[in-house]
């Protein structure tokens, strides 16, 4: 919808542009053109003055030309017939003696989005590639990519590609970088520009003459080159050494990634590089740019996966500031958890304790969870702080503290006494589902150590009709069933009332079925109840699974200096694929073959110039596979791997299933504990879509565990990675001796 009065404005400007007195005065004429541009940017339709603006391009004033060319690029699609007149003017300016005019005209011509413009811009672009002025060559090189996009699904012009490859030897560094960008765009269907030995060495020698943007770009392209020998590799690393000290964060990160990729067979070199870039990473974490700060923090967490405690001496750099946004604070809290050691634990805990009373409830709860994470190592100090937080009687604080206590007593049974002493009275400040479930679980499992446990549960039973969360009711049923075994006199009556309500009045079928199950279980006998419900109250071995082992640098080196640490590898892979599909959805694959520049790229160097494939396995979380689909797929595949391991004792299904879930392996079906023979069927999927199906079989004598694995895609590296993960989990849970 046009603005009110826009027609009058257009008429006034059109009249002014045609006024010979204004045309004779350069400043007045330019001011009128500026008014046209200003109204155009404000949303007014200024296409009616197109002809007058084309006439205004016939001037020696470069500023005026630039304004007119901006206008032409905007309205050429709306006025294609009149735009042909503009093309004639632009073609004439492409031969102007002034290189600034030639470059400006060529850039504007390549920016015209109108049908049939390709035939007009091809020759000026080719001429521009051979222009004496570097500015014109810069524009012409980028114009090649624009021209290719205008051609759509046509074949790649081999002569043009050869011309661009030869321009990689240009004396102007910006021309070189623009050539790489254009070749990457033109050859994207063929895998992008090929970096062989001559090109790689040429780019390395020209690095010092590039600006910081160009250096970062070239470092990214050099990732595609694989040195042929160790001597060549270390020569390249020596050339890149100075860029680890660059003032530009982008250059430092690009150089670091190149070091990590090239030195994949030399872990000590990778470690040395990560030590040297500690300073730039810390500086980025303190940057005023919030986006840069957040990305740097994600990279710090990535480095800590391979070098725990790498930033421990600089832990204060990760203390939160009041003015920082929420997402940066959360990242810093996560980093602080990984930097705790004997020397700084007191200072870190005091800092986290201050965050627990922050006005932002989410941040306060994250700080409490962080203290709970540290409590696995420094139990006494953390339990004391958490107990003091209960005294604040704040609902959101109490809820998270109780959840932390629940996880803590499961992994650290030595703190059970202190937790049980702190619980009485906290039930008054818990209203949400997660907090209620945690409290009820603690009262049911450790109720014999909590004097008022039956009376707290009785309050929940009395108010069960008004309880809105089915999960709370189910937890309440289980807790009372457990507590009645240790304190029958106090719990028997309320258990009867709860079972009656769940069976006769409850509308949620899951709760009703749980009540019927427990009722029938009681009819069988108290011994059977003890056998089923008296499971272990803690399992410290699960802490080994939560504390992931150090990951080799090579497992994440390819993700460094990308958004993968920010989004997560699996999510970032999905985003990248969606972007590629959206970008190329209207394009057809190119089947063209073209000649390449003889002295820069040769056939024998193509194989060595390809980027090496990553052998890192990443399992996709939350895979949902039905039993029917599993069975159908299992029967259609052959066994890819089978191995037998020594085993001692029975399998604890709950512990094993939880451990497998931590590493993103789904349990399809599993035998109950003590079954003869014992079996389990598992599934997982990697980030490339490859499916892994596994069978665990424990022989009747409980002496051997057989693992059989099938995969949908025959990839040896992925299979070995999956088997390694599976064996690690089973070995941790069952203490396999292989």
Swiss-Prot record:
Membrane topology, record value: Peripheral membrane protein
Main location: Golgi
GO MF annotations in UniProt: clathrin binding
InterPro entries for this protein: AP_beta, AP_complex_bsu_1_2_4, ARM-like, ARM-type_fold, B-adaptin_app_sub_C, Clathrin/coatomer_adapt-like_N, TBP_dom_sf
Name of the protein in its database record: AP-4 complex subunit beta-1
Gene source species: Mus musculus
Similarity comment: Belongs to the adaptor complexes large subunit family.
Keyword Transport: yes
Compartments, record wording: Golgi apparatus, trans-Golgi network membrane
Subunit structure: Adaptor protein complex 4 (AP-4) is a heterotetramer composed of two large adaptins (epsilon-type subunit AP4E1 and beta-type subunit AP4B1), a medium adaptin (mu-type subunit AP4M1) and a small adaptin (sigma-type AP4S1). Interacts with TEPSIN; this interaction requires the presence of a functional AP-4 complex. Interacts with GRIA2; probably indirect it mediates the somatodendritic localization of GRIA2 in neurons.
Disruption of the gene: reported phenotype: Mice lacking Ap4b1 are fertile, have no overt anatomical abnormalities and have normal life spans. They only show a significantly poorer rotorod performance than wild-type mice. No significant differences in body weight or grip power is observed compared to wild-type mice. The cerebella has normal foliation and a normal laminated cortical structure. Main neuronal types are present in the cerebella and the gross morphology of the soma and dendrites of Purkinje cells is normal.
């Amino acid at each position: 919808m046009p603005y009110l009065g826009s027609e009058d404005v257009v008429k006034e400007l059109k009249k002014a542009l045609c006024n010979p007195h204004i045309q004779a005065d350069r400043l007045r004429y330019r001011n009128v053109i500026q008014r046209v541009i200003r109204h155009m940017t404000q949303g007014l339709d200024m296409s009616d003055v197109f002809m007058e603006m084309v006439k205004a391009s016939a001037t020696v004033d470069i500023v005026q030309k630039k304004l007119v060319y901006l206008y032409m690029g905007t309205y050429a699609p709306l006025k294609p017939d009149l735009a042909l007149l503009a093309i004639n003017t632009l073609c004439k300016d492409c031969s102007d003696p002034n290189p600034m005019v030639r470059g400006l005209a060529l850039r504007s011509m390549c920016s015209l989005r109108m049908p049939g413009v390709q035939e007009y811009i091809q020759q000026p672009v080719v001429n521009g590639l051979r222009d004496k002025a570097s500015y014109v060559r810069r524009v012409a090189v980028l114009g090649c990519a624009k021209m290719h996009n205008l051609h759509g699904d046509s074949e790649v012009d081999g002569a043009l590609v050869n011309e661009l490859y030869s321009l990689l030897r240009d004396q102007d560094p910006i021309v070189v970088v623009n050539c790489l960008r254009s070749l990457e765009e033109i050859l994207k269907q063929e895998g992008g520009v090929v970096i062989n030995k001559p090109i790689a060495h040429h780019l390395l020698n020209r690095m010092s003459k590039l600006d910081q943007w160009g250096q970062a770009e070239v470092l990214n392209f050099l990732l595609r080159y694989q040195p042929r020998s160790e001597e060549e590799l270390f020569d390249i690393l020596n050339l890149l050494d100075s860029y680890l000290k660059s003032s530009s964060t982008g250059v430092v990160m690009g150089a670091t990634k190149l070091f990590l990729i090239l030195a994949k067979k030399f872990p000590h070199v990778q470690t040395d590089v990560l030590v040297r870039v500690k300073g730039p990473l810390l500086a980025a974490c303190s940057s005023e740019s919030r986006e840069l700060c957040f990305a740097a923090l994600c990279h710090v967490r990535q480095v800590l996966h391979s070098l725990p405690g790498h930033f421990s001496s600089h832990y204060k750099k990760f203390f939160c500031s009041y003015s920082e946004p929420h997402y940066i604070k959360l990242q810093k809290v996560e980093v602080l958890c990984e930097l705790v050691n004997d020397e700084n634990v007191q200072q870190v805990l005091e800092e986290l304790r201050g965050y627990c009373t922050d006005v932002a409830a989410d941040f306060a709860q994250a700080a409490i969870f962080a203290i709970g994470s540290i409590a696995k190592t420094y139990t006494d100090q953390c339990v004391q702080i958490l107990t003091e937080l209960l005294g604040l009687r704040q609902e959101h604080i109490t809820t998270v503290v109780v959840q932390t206590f629940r996880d803590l007593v499961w992994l650290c049974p030595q703190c059970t006494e202190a937790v049980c002493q702190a619980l009485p009275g906290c039930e008054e400040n818990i209203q949400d589902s997660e907090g209620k479930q945690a409290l009820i679980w603690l009262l049911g499992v450790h109720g014999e150590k909590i004097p008022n446990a039956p009376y707290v549960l009785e309050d929940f039973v009395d108010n069960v009709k008004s309880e809105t969360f089915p999960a709370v009711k189910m937890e309440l049923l289980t807790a009372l069933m457990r507590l009645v075994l240790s304190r029958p006199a106090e719990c028997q009556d309320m258990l009867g009332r709860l079972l009656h309500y769940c069976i006769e009045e409850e509308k949620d079928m899951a709760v009703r079925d749980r009540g019927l199950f427990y009722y029938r279980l009681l009819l069988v006998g108290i011994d059977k109840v003890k056998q089923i419900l008296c499971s272990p109250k803690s399992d410290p071995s699960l802490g080994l699974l939560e504390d992931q082992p150090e990951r080799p640098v090579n497992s994440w080196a390819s993700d460094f200096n990308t958004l993968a640490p920010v989004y997560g590898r699996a999510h970032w892979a999905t985003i990248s694929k969606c972007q590629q599909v959206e970008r190329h959805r209207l394009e057809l694959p190119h089947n063209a073959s073209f000649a390449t520049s003889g002295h820069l790229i040769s056939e024998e160097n193509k194989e060595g110039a390809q980027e090496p494939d990553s052998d890192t396995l990443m399992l996709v979380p939350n895979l949902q596979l039905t039993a029917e689909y599993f069975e159908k797929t299992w029967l259609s595949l052959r066994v890819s791997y089978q191995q037998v391991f020594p085993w001692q004792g029975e399998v604890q299904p709950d512990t094993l299933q939880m451990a497998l879930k931590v590493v993103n392996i789904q349990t399809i079906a599993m035998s109950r504990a003590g079954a003869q023979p014992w079996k389990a069927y598992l599934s997982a999927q990697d980030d490339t879509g490859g499916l892994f199906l596994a069978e665990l079989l424990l022989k009747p004598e409980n002496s051997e565990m057989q693992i059989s694995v099938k995969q949908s895609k025959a990839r040896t590296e992925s299979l070995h990675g999956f088997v390694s993960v599976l064996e690690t989990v089973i070995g941790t849970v069952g203490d396999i001796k292989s």
